[in-house]
Amino acid sequence: MLPAEELAQVKYIPTLPEFVTWIEQKWSDLPCLSDTVNTYTYRQVCDRVARKRALLNSFGLQKGDKVAILDNSTTDAVEMFLAVTSAGYVAINLPAMLPPEAVIGCCMKFGIKVLAVGKPFMEAVKGAPCKVIAITDCADQTAPVATVDKNDPAAIFFTGGTTGAPKGAILPHRALMRGALNGVYAPGHQLGCHRYACVLPLSHVFGLIYSTLSVLYKGASWYSVGNTKDTIGKLPVIKPTMLVAVPGICEILLGLVKMYGKGFLGGELDVIISGAANVPPKLIGEFDELGIHLFGGYGMTEGANLTTGNIDVKTRPTSVGKLYPEQEAKVVDGELWFRGDNVFLGYYGDPEKTAETLTPDGWVKTGDLVRFDEDGFMYIVGRIKNLIILSNGENISPESIEEPFYKDNKLRDCLVKEDEQDGRQVIAIEILPRIEEFGNAPWEEVEAYFKELVGKVNATLPSTHQVSKITVRKEDFKRTGALKVSRNQ
């Protein structure tokens, strides 16, 4: 938690227009956004945001109209998002990997009026059924922030998790800003003293809220690595003190540190905040050996990314932490329900799915099976949609079987699922090894190692939960945009 003197300096700001005004006044001359070549202060950024607002207003847009953004995680993309939302319009950050036909499809589905595009993507949006502008465009004059209600829609994010088809989750201003404030609550001093390298896409709620809006809330410096592939060359230049990354990226960074040394990360990295997927305790331990604190948490797009955070990882490494302030949670038949300012408005154009997830009195049904310990720390047990139903009627969570496997340092990822063997139902596991841990060992030794590991884990499990079929993969799993292992292999 923040020191008391810093906690007194931050407050809940319910809308993006108020937020943009506040950060300009609060952090005016501190460095705000940088691409490692050019660095802009908060005052300069807010002036550019005001000019982008004026440009958008010149198109005759109405409050609530939708503006899409297609770019890498650049300073211009951040400024355009702030401009769209502080002008009273609704921002949609499109994933940079979308093929041209999907971009056009999104424009049609969401009724997008303006599409702001980064230079690398201009060719891909020819024929878009809306006005297309360069993301760098600004007007000569400025425009004031709009007046909006905290419950007005601010942004739409794609969500689908590891199983379902993508949906458009509508987040109001209050939700974005509650999520952003939750991201300020981190251990140690936070205000005006950190450098963040943005290694996540802004189309992901984790990248936009925790890795961007929370950074600005703190008066910290936000650095673009451009295309994620450029991260390797940028981190030693940026010298970040904090990173926000999904576990898949943390695994990649750890492997590179083992190859090139800690200097690869810039030499000043102290904290990594991770989420959007299970954070294995072994990963926490390996970063701790490097003097880097890795903290996990829990959140979902429908809850503006942040619901719990765990700063007590050494004594509770498998927990996702405690609830952030001003949120309620309850467990209904094993499923986590939560509500608060961070809750979404519904899925765009899908009242049926909205009714399945959001109750009339504001509770989000997460689909996650959880438990709380006596001190209020939450633990993920599994996903309702992932349950394996045995022939005897028993429900098994594959995540509960996967958990002990993740304690092994030679395993990168695994997937437990239902399968068939000799005409009967069995529990199967697919394992992706950390192949670098095996040196030049032949593949047969790798397979033998994990067959032995399965035997050891099976000895700790009830007979109905034991793994009967094992596959050791040479190729990576199919993954989601958050680099989680997809359940649909």
Predicted regions and their residues:
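Conserved ATP/PPi-binding loop(s) of AMP-dependent carboxylate-activating enzymes
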Residues: 322-325, 333-357, 377, 392-396
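N-lobe entry segment of adenylate-forming
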Residues: 1-40, 44-59, 63
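Conserved pre-ATP/AMP-binding loop-to-beta segment of ANL
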Residues: 141-158, 165, 189-195
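Conserved AMP-binding/adenylation subdomain of ANL enzymes
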Residues: 177-195, 202-263, 268
